[in-house]
């Protein structure tokens, strides 16, 4: 049983989905996170997501997505999306606390990620530099989303 799932290989009980009034949120359609929000709402409404190890998915990954700049943009985008999903799931009264927690967490990640990137570069350790760059990118996404930004059109259908 899982709390969230990607939608590239998702079978749904449409009767349940319709009974509880769930729909994919189009505001997340081109930015990513639509499947995360939907499946989190599905579980919150009492739905169950099960993993099927035998399911096969073929997902073509263009060579351009194997480059460091794309991967860092993706990390920033995913981090921002996680905050946007939390805000969408929360009631209006909970949003200020979520935004404050996200802003603080984003700032910490930016500082630690920047330091780790610098240290990794100075000592010639690409692993530490890469992990620092990833943490820095995620921090930027979290901080941006905490203030209402961070939206990146991941998928232009």
Over which residues does each language-model region extend?
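Activation segment
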Residues: 20-21, 61
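Nucleotide-sugar-dependent glycosyltransferase catalytic core
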Residues: 27-31, 39, 58-81, 87
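A residue-level structural signature of the nucleotidyltransferase/glycosyltransferase Rossmann-like core
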Residues: 2, 9, 21, 48-50
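Catalytic donor-sugar/metal-binding loop of nucleotide-sugar-dependent glycosyltransferases
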Residues: 26-28, 36-58
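Short, well-ordered alpha-helical scaffold segment located
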Residues: 15-20, 56
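A recurrent flexible, glycine/aromatic-enriched loop bordering the glycosyltransferase active site
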Residues: 1-12, 29-33
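Non-catalytic, C-terminal membrane-associated alpha-helical segments of glycosyltransferases
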Residues: 73-80, 91-157
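Substrate-positioning beta->alpha
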Residues: 13-16, 34-38
